Amino acid sequence: GRGIKKGNPKTTYIAYGAETRKSMLADDSEKLLNWYKEKGVTPKEYYLVVGRFVPENNYETMIREFMCSKTTKNFVIITNVNDKFLDELETRLHFKKDSRIRFVGTVYDQELLKKIRENAYGYFHGHEVGGTNPSLLEALGSTDLNLLLDVPFNREVALDSALYWTKKSGSLARLIETADKMSGSEIEAYGAKAKERITKAYSWEFISSEYRKVFLGK
């Protein structure tokens, strides 16, 4: 407001933090295997989204484009479903006829969620409001291949460590098919870049050092 502008306060921006460590769960963990069996999905055979189930996160675009793609992988959506919004999406998209679309509920076990992220073939991030998002940082720290909506703050966070799509019809569908054809070494290279980006700019060690500079002058 006007008072803030008049005061001309000195401000400092400090981002969220994220981890790059691996999940403590093993690939043969009973908890993990039971989750996969219950949801009917296979490691490295699904694209993933984790986030609030609200229109501004572009679920409609992601689901529509996924349905238009020729991928044989599943689309796993981890969210607390809002029935009204879900019904609206079904009315517009008829996604229930596509067996690849999997709404699997929520996952509150953080080690299990981290492992599910690690085992995703790719991660979709459709947020376009709100600035730097913790779920994007977590994805970059855990998932090798990230497909992000092309908005300034997503590019500012991920730089060249991710692939980008727009809301234009066909953009994400084509990118999914491109991603499906990528070699293991190409995907690993993106994963290494993403983790390097988190380590340099968003690790908790780096964020803590930024706070020390502000409060302790160190």
Predicted regions and their residues:
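Donor nucleotide-sugar binding/catalytic pocket of nucleotide-sugar-dependent glycosyltransferases
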Residues: 1-34, 41-42
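Short donor-sugar binding/catalytic loops of nucleotide-sugar-dependent glycosyltransferases
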Residues: 17, 50-54, 80-82, 107
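Conserved donor-binding/catalytic core segment of Leloir-type glycosyltransferases
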Residues: 36, 40-57, 63-70, 76
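Nucleotide-activated donor-binding/catalytic signature segment of Leloir-type glycosyltransferases, i.e.
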Residues: 88-111
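Short alpha-helical segment that forms part of, or immediately flanks, the ligand-binding pocket
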Residues: 114, 136-141, 152-156
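Acidic donor-binding loop of glycosyltransferase active sites
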Residues: 115-131, 144-145
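Conserved acidic donor-binding segment of nucleotide-sugar-dependent glycosyltransferases
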Residues: 162-170, 178-184
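A charged, aromatic-enriched C-terminal amphipathic alpha-helix characteristic of glycosyltransferases
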Residues: 185-216
